[in-house]
């Protein structure tokens, strides 16, 4: 991922230095396992533990060797073994490259997922704050982009909060399914390494054992993870799109924060554009798109080919880095979000009370009219309001078939927006439960 969208913490996870450090963690864990089984002398293990390291200079040496070897793992093993000397012969004993690479990849993924989980928690806290702060902030609910029924901005935040909670649960599930390693040799048969080494090494690394590995940990695990990252990005795009719609000049119900000195357009000094929400929408496309090659990586030849490797070097870092970036960007948007309550009220008035059509329909059917007949009456009055300067209340009171069954007081009550929202506490209880207190 380009530097512009890379935050340091996540960028460090996917750095070359950290990758090779994780490879070294795996190699040392395997050496310790061999030592416990009496196959590596204790003094040799001690030297391996004390002498081996990875920093930027070591990474450069590995890259230089790779130019000759055309194999990054062999280059890594050669450089690390040189650090130790004679005892370096024990490094990589009985292993195949994927024993190291796939197991280390799980360690990298664990670090990356845990950062994303922290990001999600931050975002959820801000959404929750807005939900309670705007529990009674009246606005118009829209379906198909058209005014529907009264709503509150707080209820909109309840929807966002619950969706992010689902995404967090999905990520935790994907985390459980992807934190697997394997130390089982070239085709998973433990031909040059006993299962005890795998058990001891993976236990030290905090990973589970792939039950039926081949040369690799199977890529359906990683595909599930990438799909989950795409789902999280899709939710963020959904929320960002909502902000973009609500920031339209004609709507202007919410606005992204606009900081001192910020400029919106090179040509039009008046502009306040929802650029951060637009950026979220753009990067979400990249993250979501990466789930497709992840699923294609599931299809490998026989016990393994290398077609997935080049793909993962791109899609895993890019997806995590971009998602980390847009989660934090969305958090900043929420922190400074401007909610225009007065504009929400004025926009409600544009529909002239037509949002009450459903309640008038119910009232008429309760008076004994058939639903079809009542529907025709209400629609007739609604169309008159749309096509004239009159309010819905006025057209209802002018219609003798309405006033034959409904009093003005009943119509007034039906037009009260809070009549639509009397059960909002129930929604909050469902979403927040004990947190309501």
From Swiss-Prot:
Amino-acid positions noted as binding N(6)-(1,2-dicarboxyethyl)-AMP in the UniProt annotation, renumbered to this chain: 4-5, 70-72, 96-97, 215, 266, 271-273, 310-314
Gene3D superfamilies: Fumarase/aspartase (C-terminal domain) (1.10.40.30), Fumarase/aspartase (Central domain) (1.20.200.10), Fumarase/aspartase (N-terminal domain) (1.10.275.10)
InterPro entries on file: AdenyloSucc_lyase_C (IPR019468), Fumarase/histidase_N (IPR024083), Fumarate_lyase_CS (IPR020557), Fumarate_lyase_fam (IPR000362), Fumarate_lyase_N (IPR022761), L-Aspartase-like (IPR008948), Pur_lyase (IPR004769)
Pathway assigned in UniProt: Purine metabolism; AMP biosynthesis via de novo pathway; AMP from IMP: step 2/2; Purine metabolism; IMP biosynthesis via de novo pathway; 5-amino-1-(5-phospho-D-ribosyl)imidazole-4-carboxamide from 5-amino-1-(5-phospho-D-ribosyl)imidazole-4-carboxylate: step 2/2
Residues in coiled coil: none
Residues at the catalytic site: 144, 265
GO molecular function, one term: (S)-2-(5-amino-1-(5-phospho-D-ribosyl)imidazole-4-carboxamido) succinate lyase (fumarate-forming) activity
Name of the molecule in the record: Adenylosuccinate lyase
């Amino acid at each position: 991922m380009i530097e512009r969208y890379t935050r340091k913490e996540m960028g460090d996870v996917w750095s070359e230095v950290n990758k090779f450090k994780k490879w070294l963690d795996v190699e040392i864990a395997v050496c310790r396992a061999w030592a416990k089984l009496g196959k590596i002398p204790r003094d040799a293990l001690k030297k391996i533990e004390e002498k081996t390291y990875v920093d930027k200079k070591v990474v450069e040496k590995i890259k230089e060797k790779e130019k000759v070897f055309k194999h990054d793992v062999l280059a890594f093993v050669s450089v690390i073994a040189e650090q130790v000397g004679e005892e370096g012969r024990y490094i990589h004993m009985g292993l195949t490259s994927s024993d190291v690479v796939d197991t280390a990849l799980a360690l990298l993924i664990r670090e990356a997922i845990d950062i994303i989980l922290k990001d999600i928690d931050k975002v959820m806290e801000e959404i929750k704050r807005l939900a309670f702060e705007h529990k009674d902030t009246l606005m118009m609910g829209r379906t198909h982009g058209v005014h529907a029924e009264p709503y509150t901005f707080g209820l909109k935040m309840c929807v966002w909060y619950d969706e992010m909670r689902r995404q967090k649960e999905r990520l935790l599930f994907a985390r459980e399914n992807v934190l697997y390693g394997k130390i089982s040799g070239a085709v998973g048969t433990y031909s040059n390494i006993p299962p005890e080494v795998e058990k001891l090494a993976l236990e030290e690394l905090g990973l589970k054992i792939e039950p039926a590995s081949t040369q690799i940990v199977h890529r359906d695990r990683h595909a599930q993870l990438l799909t989950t990252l795409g789902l999280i990005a899709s939710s963020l795009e959904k929320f960002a799109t909502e902000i973009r719609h609500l920031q339209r000049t004609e709507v202007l119900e919410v606005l992204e924060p606009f900081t001192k000195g910020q400029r919106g357009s090179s040509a039009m000094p008046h502009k306040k554009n929802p650029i951060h929400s637009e950026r979220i929408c753009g990067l979400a496309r990249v993250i979501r798109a990466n789930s497709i090659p992840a699923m294609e990586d599931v299809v490998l030849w026989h016990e393994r080919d290398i077609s997935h490797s080049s793909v993962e070097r791109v899609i895993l870092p890019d997806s995590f880095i971009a998602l980390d970036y847009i989660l934090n960007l969305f958090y900043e948007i929420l922190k400074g979000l401007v909610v225009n309550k007065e504009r929400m009220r004025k926009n409600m008035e544009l529909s002239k009370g037509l949002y009450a059509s459903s309640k008038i329909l119910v009232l008429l059917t309760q008076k004994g009219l058939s639903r079809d007949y009542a529907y025709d009456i209400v629609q007739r009055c609604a169309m008159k309001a749309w096509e004239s300067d009159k309010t819905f209340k006025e057209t209802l009171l002018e219609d003798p078939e309405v006033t034959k069954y409904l009093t003005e007081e009943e119509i007034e009550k039906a037009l009260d927006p809070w009549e639509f929202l009397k059960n909002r506490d129930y929604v909050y209880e469902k979403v927040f439960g004990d947190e309501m207190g």
